[in-house]
């Protein structure tokens, strides 16, 4: 069974990335210290340096965890690590997105591959050596061993810092992409210092608190209120139906605020019909800008792809199905090599592009997604062990959520200039469901991936 699981996951993780690069085995870039196969102890507890978390509500303390800056030096092979990690997180992210969207066929969807990848790596830091193996396989950073009783471990901190380096490549204001992390542990357990450090590596600010879960309803209110306070009111009511036996809750959020590189023309905004499905039409404002774009008419996949610049390097890739074509069919074909071919085949064109104003927020239940992928039992369920997260026996990770917030305006860093040179633009009106990806252009990492079924909701 173990061999089957590994082979299935490894096949998905070995897909080509968004560029033609010399292949480097990911494990060699992210290995932990001296590469040796560490024995998996089945009986003896793993040694963990733990601390007591600050009780939630103590003097209304909402300050983030204090960062340890002693090990924040720049890493070697940074560019290569970013490129390789971008490929890995894109591959896993697209796979998870397709699982997620199967259950959200008729609703808007927003998913962050970089945020979920970081969440998994943070949880990996708390996993036992036995549980570390399926995590590494899913992430695509595993080195196989001929022995069943040992594992080659990766340096999770190195992975998380590389993810943050990818985020830092976004060349707008720092609050353009902001990541927050919350960890809530039962008050009768202590938490690993290493895990807390990983949450800090992963985020712009992290919060670790202990909670009395024996009073489940009261604990639920305290946890949700704390998240709302520390997210400036952006995030509300993440956790529901908590149990008195809860050991650990984990939540992360990523908030993207973007402006178009070239502004849309405010005077050209007009209310038009958006066809949600054959029975439903809504009236919404469509922004319009006429100018030069890079685009592709993919006749084989029956869609038009347009690149829209955001900051200097970050861009949106918008995918609009042809009239009568199925959005779901295009979603089912999403792979890193498909997106790579789209990007490579983009050509300059003169377009009159009309696009809905939209902002989007979504919440991903990671346990639910992993269950649909048939790996939750190994990673977070009954077979998962987290001796490196806490010193409490039979410690469980009960709920894991990823919150994604996406905001765009019609404003831009450059003013759109009208061109009156006699050319007739090709009209492209985004008046039906579409896909979009937010991509960091240096590493080609997909930061966000989503679909708009109805921009009015």
Locate predicted features.
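C-terminal soluble interaction/assembly domains
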Residues: 391-393, 399-457
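Non-catalytic, conformational "gating/processing" segments within enzyme and secreted inhibitor domains
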Residues: 43-55, 59, 106-107, 111, ...
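Structural recognition of the beta-strand scaffold that forms the well-ordered cores
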Residues: 118-121, 316-319, 437, 448
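Cleavable N-terminal signal peptides of Sec/SRP-targeted secreted and luminal proteins
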Residues: 3-19
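Active-site nucleophile-adjacent alpha helix/oxyanion-hole segment immediately C-terminal to the catalytic cysteine
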Residues: 115-126, 130-137
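Signal-peptide-cleavage-adjacent N-terminal segments of secreted and extracellular proteins
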Residues: 14-113, 121
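Extracytoplasmic/secreted cell-surface and envelope-processing proteins
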Residues: 131, 326-329, 362-364, 417, ...
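Internal alpha/beta scaffold segment
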Residues: 321-344
């Amino acid at each position: 069974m173990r061999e089957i699981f590994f082979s299935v996951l490894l096949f998905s993780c070995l897909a080509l990335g968004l560029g033609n690069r010399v292949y480097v085995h990911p494990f060699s870039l992210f290995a932990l210290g001296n590469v040796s196969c560490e024995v998996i102890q089945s009986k003896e507890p793993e040694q963990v340096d733990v601390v007591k978390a600050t009780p939630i509500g103590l003097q209304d303390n909402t300050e983030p965890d204090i960062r340890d800056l002693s090990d924040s030096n720049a890493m070697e092979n940074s560019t290569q690590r970013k490129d390789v990690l971008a490929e890995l997180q894109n591959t896993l992210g697209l796979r998870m997105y397709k699982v997620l969207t199967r259950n959200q066929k008729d609703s808007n969807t927003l998913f962050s591959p970089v945020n979920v990848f970081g969440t998994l790596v943070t949880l990996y830091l708390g996993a036992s050596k036995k549980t570390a193996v399926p995590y590494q396989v899913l992430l695509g950073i595993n080195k196989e061993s001929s022995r069943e009783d040992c594992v080659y471990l990766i340096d999770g901190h190195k992975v998380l810092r590389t993810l943050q380096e990818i985020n830092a490549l976004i060349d707008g204001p720092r609050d353009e992409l902001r990541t927050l992390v919350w960890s809530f542990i039962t008050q009768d357990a202590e938490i690993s210092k290493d895990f807390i450090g990983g949450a800090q590596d992963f985020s712009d600010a992290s919060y670790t608190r202990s909670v009395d879960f024996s009073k489940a309803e009261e604990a639920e209110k305290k946890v949700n209120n704390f998240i709302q306070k520390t997210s400036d009111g952006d995030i509300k009511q993440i956790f529901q139906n908590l149990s008195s036996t809860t050991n650990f809750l984990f939540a992360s959020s990523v908030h993207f605020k973007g402006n178009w590189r070239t502004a849309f023309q405010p005077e050209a905004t007009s209310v038009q019909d958006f066809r949600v499905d054959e029975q439903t039409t809504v009236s919404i404002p469509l922004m319009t800008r006429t100018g030069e774009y890079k685009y592709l008419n993919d006749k084989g996949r029956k869609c038009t792809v347009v690149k829209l610049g955001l900051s200097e390097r970050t861009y949106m890739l918008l995918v609009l199905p042809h009239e009568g074509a199925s959005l779901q069919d295009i979603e089912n074909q999403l792979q890193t090599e498909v997106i790579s071919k789209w990007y490579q085949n983009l050509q300059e064109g003169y377009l009159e592009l009309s696009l809905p104003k939209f902002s989007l927020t979504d919440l991903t239940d990671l346990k639910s997604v992993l269950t649909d992928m048939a790996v939750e039992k190994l990673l977070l369920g009954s077979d998962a062990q987290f001796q490196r997260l806490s010193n409490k026996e039979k410690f469980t990770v009960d709920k894991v959520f990823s919150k994604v917030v996406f905001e765009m305006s019609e404003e831009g860093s450059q003013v759109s200039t009208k061109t009156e040179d006699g050319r007739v633009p090709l009209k492209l009106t985004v008046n039906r469901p579409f896909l979009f990806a937010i991509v960091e252009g240096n590493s080609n990492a997909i930061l966000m991936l989503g679909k708009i079924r109805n921009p009015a909701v």
